[in-house]
UniProtKB/Swiss-Prot annotation:
Gene: ndk
One GO MF term: metal ion binding
Protein name, as recorded: Nucleoside diphosphate kinase
Keywords: ATP-binding, Cytoplasm, Kinase, Magnesium, Metal-binding, Nucleotide metabolism, Nucleotide-binding, Phosphoprotein, Transferase
Function: Major role in the synthesis of nucleoside triphosphates other than ATP. The ATP gamma phosphate is transferred to the NDP beta phosphate via a ping-pong mechanism, using a phosphorylated active-site intermediate.
Amino acid sequence: MSAERTLILVKPDGVSRGLVGEVVGRLERKGLTLVALELRTLERSVAETHYGEHASKPFFGELVDFIVSGPLVALVAEGPRAVEASRGLIGATDPVKAAPGSLRGDYALEIGQNLVHGSDSPESAKREIDLFFPGLS
């Protein structure tokens, strides 16, 4: 089976709580390989582009404000069915509905500060990787 890539963001709440190692460890134990990793604070324009699909929604401003509020870790993981595999590890967007054992189920409480982002499709992954790591693809 061919390798697929996905973008994972450990959001500012995950970084400030010291959970980067937990996220990376779970991805690696699942069998995914890290091909890029960077600690950075996002520029607002990058955040607005990343969350562009939500621009007309009432929570857009809060979402952007949060993601630029502190450093995050952006990483690219690779492996068979990487998008699907990482989404399973991450859990449902609403942490209260996320399964125990998932990152959000174990470590997050609020939908707005839900620890981690993962690409939701191979097409989104390509777009997001191009935004965060231009030249990697």
